């Protein structure tokens, strides 16, 4: 697995990796992680196409999903530990 790029973002860490003819977009926030695998053949402009996919609308959805993940984890944690 090879790191292609790391993109700056104020809320989470975005890494683009390459492995087995796939681009892997890894987005991390705290203990949570979202990973998206995109075959190289599906992209016409290589890694530049990944940059286009990571638009503001997508990143807002990612942020909302992190919020949901945090809530789900806290709910289950408190259900079994308190």
Which role does the model predict for each range below?
Residues 2-37:
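N-terminal acidic leader/helix
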Residues 43-82:
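Mixed-charge, Lys/Arg-enriched low-complexity segments
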């Amino acid at each position: 697995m090879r790191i292609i790029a790391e993109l700056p973002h104020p809320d989470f860490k975005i890494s683009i990796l390459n492995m087995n003819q796939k681009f892997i977009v890894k987005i991390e926030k705290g203990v949570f992680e979202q990973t998206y695998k995109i075959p190289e053949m599906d992209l016409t402009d290589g890694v530049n196409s990944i940059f286009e996919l990571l638009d503001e609308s997508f990143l807002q959805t990612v942020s909302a999903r992190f919020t949901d993940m945090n809530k789900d984890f806290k709910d289950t944690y408190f259900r079994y530990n308190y």
